[in-house]
Regions:
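Short, Lys/Arg-enriched, disordered terminal segments
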Residues: 1-12, 72-75, 96
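Conserved HGGG/HGGXW glycine-rich cap/lid loop of the alpha/beta-hydrolase fold
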Residues: 4-52
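Glycine-rich, phosphate-binding/catalytic loops in enzymes
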Residues: 31-34, 57-59, 98-100
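Active-site loop/oxyanion-hole signature of alpha/beta-hydrolase fold enzymes
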Residues: 41-82
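Conserved hydrolase catalytic core segment
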Residues: 78-105
Length: 105
């Protein structure tokens, strides 16, 4: 799993999780619109990471990796999280785990 960051650190934090078979690049038009007002983090889900040989194992594993990133790199807090398709399932698992604070999902 990889995390691509854009925008202004210190601004409200927005996490984007793409769906099955697509990379974070699906969000690039949106990121272009939001990066001036937000600290945007786009997740690169295992198995769909461009230029890397990774393997998708499970939704739970992906959720665990995102939670670890939020705790270690963002102090355990996000302002906004959005998951597209499979990304929504991963986000649901993150919320169910109740390990990090997400204001809006």
């Amino acid at each position: 799993m990889d995390f691509k960051t854009f925008g202004n650190i210190g601004s409200p934090t927005l996490l984007l999780i793409p769906g099955l078979g697509v990379s974070y690049e699906i969000f690039m038009p949106l990121i272009g619109l939001l990066e001036e007002r937000f600290h945007v983090i786009a997740v690169q889900v295992d198995g769909f990471t461009l230029g890397q040989n990774t393997e998708f194992t499970s939704v739970d594993d992906q959720a665990q990796q995102v939670c670890k990133y939020i705790k270690e790199d963002l102090g355990g807090h996000l302002d906004i999280a959005y998951g597209l398709s499979l990304g929504g399932k991963i986000l649901s698992q993150i919320l169910e785990r109740n390990e990090v604070a997400i204001e809006h999902a």
